[in-house]
């Protein structure tokens, strides 16, 4: 009898496995589908024009076959302007919006015409959301390019978190735990307000396809 219960438990686990560890078999790309990419480019690799990250990003942008490309934190110096514009020139329609600091830029590159744009701003510096209407064939599709508050953990916080996980018995672990929980909780509250603000606006658009 024990083996029978074990068998049922194994079958039940196997049925649920795909939900937690999905294994996707490659399938042909459906005809007429839209490929979308979105990245936080973090100022295109930092301040130096010769960094490996910057050159790699330029190459990636040049070779991207996405129909719609969304980027966050798209700041750049005047010295980079021509190179970056050349890298994204294969997208016919392009738009960048800045609110507050120049580092908070959002960029949309599209194969489809941009009909209009709505910008939602938030109290926290550098966080904005741009909602676009694109003409895709005979349809109108809404594309959301958003930059919400993150979990607010800096490099020191991440280091403290790793040490807390590896050595939970250390005296400072409890204090670090309480401090990080408080910090992430505050960031989460700000992010929730931003998400609610976006959703309130999207509800006014009615029944239209939305890419987020």
Show the residue positions of the predicted features.
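Structured beta-strand-rich core segments of catalytic domains in phosphoester-bond hydrolases
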Residues: 5, 11-30, 49, 62, ...
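Active-site beta-strand/loop signature of hydrolases that rely on acidic residues for catalysis
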Residues: 35-41, 53, 57-81, 142-147, ...
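Acidic/histidine-rich helix-loop elements
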Residues: 38-54, 152-187
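Active site of divalent-metal-dependent phosphoester/diester hydrolases
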Residues: 93-108, 175-204
């Amino acid at each position: 009898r024990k083996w029978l219960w074990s068998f049922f438990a194994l079958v039940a686990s196997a049925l649920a496995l795909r939900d937690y560890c999905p294994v996707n078999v490659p399938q042909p790309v459906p005809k007429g589908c839209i490929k979308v990419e979105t990245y936080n480019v973090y100022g295109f690799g930092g301040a130096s024009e010769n960094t490996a990250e910057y050159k790699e990003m330029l190459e990636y942008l040049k070779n991207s076959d996405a129909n719609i490309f969304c980027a966050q934190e798209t700041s750049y110096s005047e010295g980079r302007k021509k190179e970056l514009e050349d890298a994204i020139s294969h997208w016919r329609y392009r738009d960048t919006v800045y609110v507050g600091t120049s580092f908070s830029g959002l960029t949309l590159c599209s194969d489809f015409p941009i009909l209009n744009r709505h910008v939602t701003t938030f109290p926290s510096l550098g966080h904005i959301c741009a909602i676009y209407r694109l003409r895709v064939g005979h349809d109108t599709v809404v594309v959301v390019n958003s930059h919400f508050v993150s979990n607010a953990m800096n490099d020191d916080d991440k280091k403290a978190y790793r040490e807390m996980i590896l050595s939970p018995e250390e005296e400072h672990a409890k204090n670090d735990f309480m401090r990080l929980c408080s910090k992430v909780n505050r960031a989460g509250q700000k992010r929730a307000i931003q998400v609610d603000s976006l959703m309130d606006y999207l509800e006014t658009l009615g029944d239209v396809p939305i890419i987020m």
